[in-house]
From Swiss-Prot:
EC numbers: 2.3.1.117
Family: Belongs to the transferase hexapeptide repeat family.
Keyword Plastid carried by entry: no
Gene this chain is encoded by: dapD
SUPFAM superfamilies named in the record: Trimeric LpxA-like enzymes
Name by which UniProt lists this protein: 2,3,4,5-tetrahydropyridine-2,6-dicarboxylate N-succinyltransferase
Native source organism of the sequence: Coxiella burnetii (strain RSA 493 / Nine Mile phase I)
Record GO terms (molecular function): 2,3,4,5-tetrahydropyridine-2,6-dicarboxylate N-succinyltransferase activity; nucleotidyltransferase activity
């Protein structure tokens, strides 16, 4: 994989020197090999190592090069046609899902996204570079953006949106760690991280500029929901006191044992 990384990095530095029609064969093959590695889960856009998430920038480069070098093509979906550069993940009988993966009709998964065993997709959208780990449910009309990393046993409720982050290359993707619940119509975007075991209420919107207020510590932070947080939508007064600003409010923090005994609705009501 080291050779592949070197080819992709060099190609990205010289990307203005070739087009769809003139891309060298060696680069074309390296791009497709990288997309295939992302597609089957052997490579991830981001990985957690020694407790820290690290981004594989070169894998992002490969996706951007894929967009640049692939021609527009017509894709036959049986009942309609699509016109795009990137094919769907399951295009024929030879590209079967892994064991236990369920893809309900009208769910869309692009090539280069990975679905681990025992994931369930209701009619939803999974973009290129995304990684969805085992036991996760992506509910109806939920979206998982490019390069987003979704952990094990996560529930993305109806209409929830997990934002994609392709550029800048060094930026972390949006990350939802294991055992999280993301409420209906909530949006987690711009590389925000929701740590393990957190519960996000319905209609919570969190980007990098959204204040995250911890009711217990009275601290305001940005870009990260700590492990075990129970989060609801709220607001904080402005510095001049003339208006309120939307905020995400951490009303409490719970451990796995508490979550197993108490329903999600009870946790949120107690806030």
């Amino acid at each position: 994989m080291t050779d592949l990384k070197t080819i992709i990095e060099e190609a990205y530095q010289n990307k203005d020197n070739f087009t769809t029609d003139t891309v060298p064969k060696k680069i074309h093959q390296a791009i497709h090999q990288t997309i295939e590695l992302l597609d089957n889960g052997e490579l991830r856009i981001a990985e957690k190592q020694n407790g820290q998430w690290n981004t594989n920038e070169w894998a992002k480069m490969a996706i951007l090069l894929y967009f640049k070098t692939e021609p527009l093509k017509t894709f036959d979906a049986g009942y309609t046609f699509f016109y795009d550069k990137i094919p769907l993940k399951y295009t024929n009988n030879t590209s079967q899902p892994q064991s236990g993966v369920r893809v309900v009709p009208h769910a869309i998964v692009r090539k280069g996204a990975y679905l681990a065993p025992n994931t369930v997709l209701m009619p939803s959208y999974i973009n290129i570079g995304a990684y969805v780990d085992s036991g996760t449910l992506i509910d109806t009309w939920a979206t998982v953006g490019s390069c987003a990393q979704i952990g094990k046993n996560v529930h993305l409720s109806g209409g929830a949106g997990i934002g994609g982050v392709l550029e800048p290359l060094q930026a972390h993707p949006t990350i939802i760690e294991d055992d999280c619940f993301i409420g209906a119509r909530s949006e987690i975007v711009e590389g925000v991280m929701v740590e393990k075991g957190s519960v996000i209420s319905m209609g919570v919107f969190v980007g990098q500029s959204t204040p995250i207020y911890n009711r217990q510590t009275q601290e305001i932070t940005y870009g990260r929901i700590p492990a075990g947080s129970v989060v609801i939508p709220g607001s904080l007064p402005s510095k001049d006191g003339h208006y309120n600003r939307y905020s995400a409010i951490i009303v409490k923090q719970v451990d796995k044992k508490t979550r197993s005994k108490v329903s999600l609705n009870e946790l949120l009501r107690e806030g």
